[in-house]
Amino acid sequence: RRVAENTKNLKVFCTYMDTLRPGRGCADILPEGVKDAGAIGVMINHCEKPMSLPQMKLTIDRARELDMLVFACADTLDEAKAIAQLHPDIINPEPSEIIGGGKGASPMAYVMDSIRAIKEVDPSIMVEQAAGITNGQQVYDFIMAGSEAAGAASGIMNAADPIAMIDEMIAATRRAADDLK
């Protein structure tokens, strides 16, 4: 909650929530609790917490009941297309084998194919590319290829100077936005 209350431009997402309703549910993550804690959305289907399509649908429906955004991860193009049919707000199509940095970023052909596949199902879904991003140039290249956002958790945390890497990636995002005008 403190992060959400003390930042102007940072949007807080929960990394998972269950679909239960207030009442019984020991050890479950209550959606209302997630929202009350300051999250505006929920991440679903990360490779470290995979979900079935029916479970994703239930989670998206619960998030919608609470006016929360949904950020979905997809491991393959086929999974990205299937998840797009559930209409989350954002899809991050990232092959799980390259998540965590050090193994290279998503190939540009995959980036472009995944954007196209998702937009063919639902043009309103924002596509974020993230797997394996380790520098600002990759952020710039992915945005110039059509990605609407870029993520880089391990690329930042594993950098020699994480603050400098954040600055580099933000500058690359700004440069791409300016170049696309």
Question: Residue spans of the language-model regions?
Answer:
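Catalytic cores of alpha/beta
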Residues: 2-3, 29, 74-87, 132-150
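Active-site rim beta-loop-alpha module in soluble metabolic enzymes
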Residues: 69, 73-122, 128-129, 133
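Glycine/small-residue-rich loop that forms an oxyanion/phosphate-binding "nest" at active or ligand-binding sites
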Residues: 8-63
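Glycine-rich beta-to-alpha transition loops that act as phosphate-gripper elements at the mouths
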Residues: 15-27, 54, 72-77, 126-137
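Glycine-enriched alpha-helix->loop->beta-strand junction motifs that scaffold or abut catalytic
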Residues: 6-13, 35-42, 86-92, 143-150
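C-terminal helical cap(s) of enzyme catalytic domains, especially alpha/beta-barrels
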Residues: 59-63, 105-108, 155-181
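Hydrophobic faces of well-ordered beta-strands that scaffold small-molecule active sites
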Residues: 12-15, 42-44, 70-72, 91-93, ...
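Glycine-rich phosphate-binding active-site loops on the catalytic face of alpha/beta enzymes
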Residues: 40-51, 91-103, 145-166
